[in-house]
Amino acid sequence: MEEEPLLAGSINQGSGDYGAHSESCLHYPDEHTPRSRRLSYSVTDDSCNVEEDADADLYVQQAVVFIEDAIKYRSINHRVDSGSLRLYRWYYSNLCQWGLGLTIAVVLALAFIERPSSLTYTSDIRVKPKPWEPPCGMTEGIEIVCLCIFILDVTAKGYLIGWEEFRMNKWLLAYLIVITASVIDWMLSISMLCDENLRVRRLIRPFFLLQNSSLMKKTLKCIKRTLPEIASVILLLALHICLFTMIGMLIFAKSDDPKQNGEWQTYFRNLPKALSSLLVLLTTANNPDVMIPAYSLNRGYSIFFILFSVFGTYLLMNLMTAIIYNQFRGYLLMSVQTSIIRRRLGIRAAFEVLCCPGRGHTSTQAEGHVERVAVSMFLKVMERVHMKSYCRQAIVKAARRFPDGFISGEDFQRLFNELDKDFVKEHPPKPEYSSSGLQHIQYVYSHYYISVLGNAVALANVICICTVLVLNAEKSASEKNYFYMEIINCIFILYYLIEMLLKIVAFGWKGYLSYRNNIFDGFLTVLLLAIQIVIFITFKIPYVDVDPVPRHVMALWEMIRLVNMLIVFRFLRIIPEIKLMAVVASTIVDLVKNLRAFAGILLVVYYMFAVLGIWLFQGAISPPSNMSLVSNSSLENITGPYSMECGTFEQLEYWPNNFDDFASSLILLYNIMVVNNWHVFTDAYARYTTDWSLVYFVVWWLTSSVMWVNLFVALILENFTYKWDRSNGLSVEDVERIAYQSTVQLMFKEHVKEPTEEELLAQLHQHPHLHLSW
């Protein structure tokens, strides 16, 4: 994931006095020039030759930081003096960044224990006990510690980039405003003894997560630019719904015959009801319910609903998916372009600062500009760079191959192409045996068909379990005969154990563990064997003589059920053996690895809507005062907003779905995002509160189900298409290696325009703290 860039906005050429303190390498512009950078850093042949030894470590330190910036796609526009670079590296160290991430997680998790607390075993408002409420000052104390850490965070960022750049960075200014607002709201809470009804800071807490990720900010920017195209389709959808609403109200108008008023009474009674009915039909959540009253009178009425669904659900909604895919892919490509430029710029900056004369270099004397870097100096830098060990080894290995001992600018850039590649583990060689028997075992159990046989045995085991489950489906735990099931399990587990041991003999211990499939199989086999031994020791043999005490029977059944679940789970070993399934599994892994930013923004949206839902609807739905798990028929005589009609909130017993605490709010929002029966929630909250509550749910549906789900589908298509195209012509064993180049940047590499050397040098000239002159 890209880390937070210290400068995302434009660069002010007249920024203040931030730079290196080594006077031998300083470049002094005209002192009469307003806002000149008197301490800006420059590299010139004469000055660097004077105090070469004193400045050598600074140059190396600068190159190290610039390379680390390139690795993480960070901006290089920060201070470059020795003290600032040490602070900068400490700030972006794993310890500091993990600490900041933990702080963000803690401040977001406070919503689960703050009032209204989610610390109950159930969210069903009929039986929900009174939750534990933290004493006043407990969560506030944790929160103020987190806010102090955020203050230190924004202070460090402001110092490292300088005030001129800080005030032009909208994200950092917003960060400062959010911290200030949170502190003020926190002080109000303390002054009111935690008895306030509204905590504004809860709504803006997700900003801390958002601002800490460069990828999230880029994704949000892409979504913002895609909104106009999405809005045009939403407007067309609104026109489509309104048009069919008016036609529907004309077709299904109230008749003098009460028997023909079923459609009007239920779905087209008034304009808001008709609009909401067709909006829900657009998501197919109430299909064919909305059509049945009219369809039962005349089959011709079905044409109206079919036309509405065809044009709305299947044309316009899929058109929106296509637009989101097309537009967002373009903007994501622009974001990737920016990331590539940052990487190239950071690497070029490292090359330039290492080109100071006098430290193992060559230069073009006609121009006085250094063109090459000594390999020895480069290796010294690479020893101090924090990066993945396999990338470092690959880069160092490639650098040692230069015959003349020098690296040009183009070769310097090319060395770091290894950063885009994931590590592909090489399997260790098989052990050599002198015994013919062991050699025969090695030949047989290292063959591909042994894996096929193992998959067939696993399939047979699953089929046996399914057969037993079908035969015992109607039996209780005390009625089941566990003897035959355990005999079957023991036979298969014994085969799994023998297979594992012989594979270890064939591949060797290290070779066996070098395959992820073997690790998966071996772990489950050992676990199954351990559970089976526990069953033998605890319940003895035969199982038909198990003590009929229900407690013992249930304990045995639970352990056997655990064994069966592990055996079924072990059957997932077939996924890497089938090419299409391997590609799908690889796509899922890449989505988790590369698209975390999208999940992060979805978390932000969920968090904000959950807090807003608590504000608007907390306690809105409540069961009858004398209700305690009463039957459905007892509600029929109760007046008020309650309804026991078929398909209503009360009849379906959706009581656990509410906005009475943060955890239940998240679950309710998820249920609405899935859109199955989401009209049940909108109808209930409209009855218990007001019809305007529909606005909240429609906005959530548009945000989550329409925009975000379509966006996620589009990105899955892009990722899968990329993987599938690269997998054509590969064998099953090679599919796993597709992940060797699987970053988002490389997905769009062929469409990205590489920056030219002139463009990179021009941007380096605009660096606010590093003034390079040739």
From Swiss-Prot:
Gene3D superfamilies this protein is in?
A: 1.10.287.70, Voltage-gated potassium channels. Chain C
Transmembrane stretches in the record are: 93-113, 141-161, 171-191, 198-218, 233-253, 303-323, 453-475, 487-507, 519-539, 565-585, 597-617, 697-717
Q: Which residues lie on this side of the membrane: Extracellular?
A: 114-140, 192-197, 254-267, 293-302, 476-486, 540-564, 618-658, 682-696
**Region annotation (Interaction with phosphatidylinositol 3,5-bisphosphate) ranges:** 217-221
- Modified after translation how? N-glycosylated.
Give the catalysed reaction(s), semicolon-separated.
Na(+)(in) = Na(+)(out); Ca(2+)(in) = Ca(2+)(out)
What assembly does the database describe for this protein? Homodimer.
Q: What is this protein called?
A: Two pore channel protein 2
Q: Which organism is it from?
A: Danio rerio (Zebrafish)
Q: Encoded by which gene? A: tpcn2
